[in-house]
Amino acid sequence: MTLRSILHYPDNRLRQLCPNQTEYNDDLRKLISDMFETMYHEKGIGLSAIQINVITRVITIDVSKDKNEKIVLINPLILEKREPIVFDEGCLSVPGFYEKVDRYNYIKYQANDIEGKVFEAESTDLLAVCIQHEIDLSLIHI
């Protein structure tokens, strides 16, 4: 595992549209391992690959208090969203800044797992908000 540097706003590299991840191999596993190490080191709950200057749609998340519930979403896509809320969000790429953002408390989404298999899942509350935030980063919504 390698600790990676996080890009900070207004770095223009954060404004790149990320293409879908197409290769599922040891390089991807290493990237994901590095992303978790970096995210935990920075005390974050989510990280998009673009934040460490890797231009692909890979997201790592762990909203658990004990940091033992790792979630990896590759090429995530929101299929359904309900229950609008306003959430006070922070971002590792904009340290110390928080802003109220319109989100949804419930989402149904599709993603690939680390082997490339497509799956669907539902999330609510903080996890749903975190997924929406990280997807936005990979789609140039910073």
Feature map (PLM): residue ranges:
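Positively charged
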Residues: 1-140
